[in-house]
Amino acid sequence: MRQLLTYMRDEKHIPPERLEFKDIKAETIAEFLLWLEKNGQISISTRNQRLAAIHSFYRYAQTEYPDNLLEMQRILSIPFKKKSRPTVNYLTKEEMKLLLEQPDVRNHKGRRDLALMAILYDTGARVQELIDLCVKDIRLHAPATVTLKGKGNKMRCVPIMGNTVQLVSRYMDDYNLKSNGRQQSPLFFNSRGEKLTRPGICYILNKYFKQAKKANPESILSDRIHPHMLRHAKAVHMLESGVNLIYIRDFLGHASVTTTEIYLKTETELKRSVLEKNYPDVVTQDIPEWRNDTDLLQWLNDFCR
């Protein structure tokens, strides 16, 4: 509301102490929102947040000042602006395979980097969830799982596959992470024994992505990589394999399945395969028998004259 008062003072030349309800109409609010977008260079989400605050104020005000009810209702009817969904960038199965082939597993660091990328993909973890992983969060014996701390400190337990278990186990042996007293240690750490940072993880991914792209320019179609692309890749690959969307929601730790639905829009072929699996082939190329009956068609034509 402070920004609205500033707008009324600077653009409408009405200081806050003289401002009355009659000075603010629905058109004024619409102009204010447009002014915010042009001068504040705010996103659609921020614009909608400002409008939500105005709506909240006017919902209260209409009960206290019913004389202005009509105009307040017009203000409350101002719609939120829709925003287009961002494109989901992800690695294909082939790209993911080529990326994981890059680390040199003949040395400790290469095995660490491979284990890190395998965990990031296999669990669909957010980069911060990976950073926060401790040794105690890994269960290597069957059923092998990783416990992730997501947004709002919500915990979720996700399975990891056999190949990933072997990679992580070998890495933990290399760095003596299975010994007593290491349970609270970060699973992945730098040379100082501290948690890896987001830029550090991005550096690791970019290093091997560039190697993979240089060695396989025709197979690596993506131009760049960031940690969230591995999370997107896991979700899309699960969907391609026919995994239920509700399970993918729980696997990724989404609060709503609406968020998970963005993966249904990733590519035309994926949407086509999902539709073909779930909908019967109603349309056929067969010509109904009555179309071949020329006498019947002639009778219908004569009847309609």
Regions inferred by a protein language model and the residue ranges of each:
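Conserved catalytic core of the tyrosine transesterase superfamily
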Residues: 1-305
